[in-house]
Each structure stands twice: as structure tokens, then as C-alpha cells.
Regions:
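Noncatalytic accessory or regulatory domains flanking protease catalytic cores in secreted, cell-surface
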Residues: 346-420
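Acidic, Ser/Thr/Pro-rich low-complexity intrinsically disordered segments
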Residues: 309-360, 369, 377-383
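Helical hinge/lid and interdomain linker segments adjacent to catalytic or ligand-binding clefts
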Residues: 43-156
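Catalytic beta-strand/loop cores that center a nucleophilic Ser/Cys/Thr
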Residues: 178-247, 255, 259-262
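Non-catalytic extracellular/lumenal accessory regions of secreted precursors
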Residues: 279-330, 406-414, 418-422
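Bacterial N-terminal signal peptides that target proteins for export
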Residues: 1-9
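Class I SAM-dependent methyltransferase SAM-binding "motif I" and its flanking Rossmann-like core
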Residues: 132, 148-194
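Bacterial N-terminal signal peptides
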Residues: 9-16
Length: 422
């Protein structure tokens, strides 16, 4: 029998992992671009039009609805994905070392408190860790509430994520179409001129929130404003964002619902939001500066809480540097497997021009297997960037209710290796 991520998935007709790989781009060092959360108490969508139009890869969590019925199995399966399971101990959002496995998360509309509660404290912490490690976050309606600390009615909900460390305000507006204006200095104008009039018509709104300028925290920015005179939301933030520092991901909250539109300025709006979140992705971190003659073992598991020495995940890069001395005749970089872990494809790259990536590195070894060597004759003195890339990944299998992981599930908990410069 073929291994599956969740062999008991057939017990539930509610949860699926839907995968659309429009443009797998391993040079970025992420497994996929977007993870769309349509879990418990959220709208479950099969695809995101903006991801399709931007040619971004996406995977989606879908669960049961009130009309179809929600069972304990739905909760167990959602949290097996997001919190962890035997195949993936720290969950689908994170690599074994805690780095983000996706470039960003998108959270659908629905009921924020109920979804946050369903995530459990451990699941909410996975989202916080994802953003802290550099993953982006975009949420609309319920997803916007969920990002915040709380609201004017209750400034601190334990069910919320608090990745935007401030409050929002309930617009008290249901099932209406609203207009949106684009401030002249909005960063979203980098991606679209929105027809030249800085105005977007007929964006659906159903219980969403807004950001009062008086409540905007330092470092946050309002990207779009409501144009709806009958309500206090008028002239206040419709979409706002926050990036805590250079190493964290950008968090963006959107009160209304542009996400399902397939053409026109409302699609432009959603595309611009996604692109600005992705623009906030920080540069990868260097694991260590290697010393010639000193092997470095990357064998720790997630539970060891030692990211600098933790195993590599699927489609992930580990980056290193080494200082090449004057007069060096030959430089050898060796990648070695540990017993029982030979059957993985790890690539080796080196570059003097910044981070060593597939497609841009002068020196490379992309042979099959893990054990390999890269030899550089007469290397120039200076800083040489090295990287290890794990090309082994899971496969996806289409099922009636979506796509499951199959094949190399073992890679999800990471591949250990040793790297040595001589």
C-alpha cells in the first residue's frame, strides 16, 4: 500500500489539501508560494484567482461546513496538518528548522474567534512562528480580525493571533457593496494604477472590520481606504499592513472580500495585496560561516530546538559562507550522508555573487543522491557563499475531495547531512 500523509482521510469527506503548482520556483527556497487556510469556521475555497493570474503555486486546507456537518475528525485532521503529526512534527507551515515552508499564508473569511479556537494554542503558535520566521500573512474579513490582538469591544481575544499587535473595529456592515479609494502614496500603486482614478467599485463586504487612523500602531500603514459615507468606516483603513522588522514577514489585513473576483480592478486589488505581502519576504538567513577542515553536522530534529544544526526540508535551502584565503590552489566542498539517509537528492551550490541559488550559481553539483563534491580550482580570495538544496519532496495525489501527500513523506521531518570545506 502506498504511504499517504493521512491514510485515514477517507473517514472524513471534509478535509483536503488541494494543490495547484502553477510555477514551482525552487530558487526562492520555499516548497510553495501560498498556503490558503479554509479550515474550520472559514469559507473553504478550491482556488484563489489572484494566485492563478500571478502564476503562484498554492495549497489549500478545506474542511466541513455547517451545512455539510463538522465532526471531531475535521478538528483532528486540521490540527494534524497545522500543528503536527508523525510525518511532520511541527506542521505543514514550517520547515524542520522553523523556517517558513510557504512564502505566505492567506486566511479566508468566516468566523475569526471560532477558527482561532479550533486551531488550539499550539496551532495559533504555529502561525505566529511562521510570521516571526519571515512568512507573510494576508487575511480578509475573518482573516483580518484573526491577525489582530482584538477589537474595540474586546482589545484582547486569546483566540486571535496578535501578529498585528493592535486592535481593529467592526464596521457593522453586512452583505453590502462598498467603494474603496487608493491613497496617492499607497505601496499598492507599484503593482496597478487601478484604472487611473484611484477608485475601486463594488467590493463585497460582509461583517468585516476597518482600521481607524487613531488606532494605527507605529510602523503600520494604511494601503486602501473605505469610501462609504453612511458609516464611521468612511475614510478609514480598508486594507492595512505591518512588518515588525527586517526578519519577519509582512502581515496584511483586508476588511472586505476581493479574493474571489476573476477580472477587473477588484482582481487587481487582490493581486496587488498578494504581491506586497510577498515583497516583504526577508532575505534568507546564513546558517553559519564554515571553517576549512571542520565538518558541520546538520542532523538535529525539530524537537532539539537547534535551528542552526537542524535537518533540511523539501525544496529548502541551507545557506553558509566560507572565507577563502589568498593563494588557495583548490577548494573542495563535500556533502556527506548519514547512515540510512543516502536516498535523497541534495544539490550543492557556490557563488561569489551573493546567495548561491539554483539558476544563478557559477559552481554547482546537481547529481542524484546526497553524497557529492564540488571542486573549485584556483578560487579567488574572499567570501564564498555556499548552499545545500533538498530536491526530494512529497508527491500529491488527486482524490475526490482534494489532494493528499504521498510518496516521500519521510522528507517532511528533514534530511540530515554533513558539509565540509577542505
Amino acid at each position: 500500500m502506498k504511504n499517504r500523509y493521512f491514510p485515514f482521510l477517507t473517514l472524513s469527506l471534509c478535509l483536503s489539501l488541494f494543490s495547484t503548482a502553477h510555477s514551482q520556483t525552487p530558487e526562492r527556497g520555499f516548497y510553495k508560494d501560498i498556503y490558503m487556510d479554509g479550515g474550520l469556521s472559514l469559507t473553504s475555497k478550491q482556488y484563489l484567482p489572484s494566485a492563478r493570474s500571478l502564476m503562484l503555486s498554492i495549497e489549500t486546507l478545506r474542511t466541513g461546513t455547517k451545512s455539510l456537518g463538522i465532526t471531531d475528525v475535521d478538528t483532528l485532521l486540521q490540527n494534524a496538518l497545522l500543528v503536527g503529526n508523525e510525518f511532520d512534527t511541527n506542521g505543514i507551515l514550517l520547515y524542520p528548522d522553523g523556517a517558513p515552508r510557504y512564502r505566505m499564508v492567506y486566511v479566508n473569511g468566516g468566523t475569526a474567534k471560532s477558527h482561532g479556537r479550533s486551531l488550539t494554542p499550539e496551532g495559533r503558535e504555529r502561525f505566529r512562528a511562521f510570521v516571526k520566521a519571515g512568512g507573510g500573512y494576508l487575511g480578509s474579513c475573518a482573516g483580518a480580525y484573526l491577525a489582530c490582538e482584538g477589537t474595540h469591544g474586546n482589545p484582547h481575544y486569546e483566540e486571535y493571533l496578535g501578529i498585528y499587535p493592535g486592535i481593529c473595529t467592526n464596521a457593522q456592515l453586512q452583505n453590502k457593496r462598498v467603494c474603496v479609494t487608493v491613497p496617492a502614496d499607497s505601496p499598492l500603486l507599484r503593482y496597478s494604477d487601478f484604472g487611473g482614478d484611484l477608485h475601486i467599485d463594488s467590493v463585497y463586504h460582509n461583517g468585516g472590520c476597518y482600521m481607524d487612523y487613531a488606532d494605527l500602531i507605529p510602523g503600520a500603514e494604511i494601503l486602501l481606504q473605505y469610501d462609504y459615507p453612511p458609516k464611521p468606516m468612511h475614510g478609514n483603513g480598508c486594507v492595512w499592513s505591518y512588518k515588525a522588522d527586517e526578519q519577519t514577514g509582512r502581515v496584511m489585513a483586508c476588511g472586505p472580500h476581493p479574493e474571489g473576483i476573476v477580472s477587473g480592478e477588484r482582481l487587481d486589488m487582490m493581486e496587488a495585496m498578494v504581491q506586497y505581502v510577498l515583497e516583504g519576504t526577508p532575505q534568507p538567513r546564513i546558517k553559519a560561516s564554515l571553517t576549512k577542515g571542520e565538518p558541520r553536522l546538520m542532523s538535529c530534529k525539530t524537537e532539539d530546538n537547534d535551528p542552526a544544526h537542524t535537518r533540511i526540508g523539501d525544496k529548502q535551502y541551507h545557506h553558509f559562507t566560507v572565507e577563502v584565503p589568498e593563494g588557495c590552489d583548490t577548494l573542495k566542498i563535500k556533502l556527506s550522508s548519514l547512515e540510512g539517509y543516502q536516498n535523497y537528492d541534495l544539490f550543492l551550490f557556490a557563488s561569489y555573487e551573493g546567495l548561491a541559488m539554483l539558476g544563478s550559481s557559477k559552481y554547482k553539483n546537481v547529481g542524484q543522491g546526497l553524497d557529492k563534491e564540488l571542486v573549485i580550482l584556483a578560487p579567488k580570495a574572499g567570501t564564498l557563499f555556499l548552499s545545500v538544496f533538498c530536491d526530494t519532496t512529497v508527491e500529491s495525489e488527486e482524490a475526490r475531495y482534494g489532494t493528499m501527500y504521498t510518496g516521500r513523506l519521510d522528507v517532511l521531518n528533514g534530511v540530515p547531512y554533513q558539509i565540509l570545506v577542505e
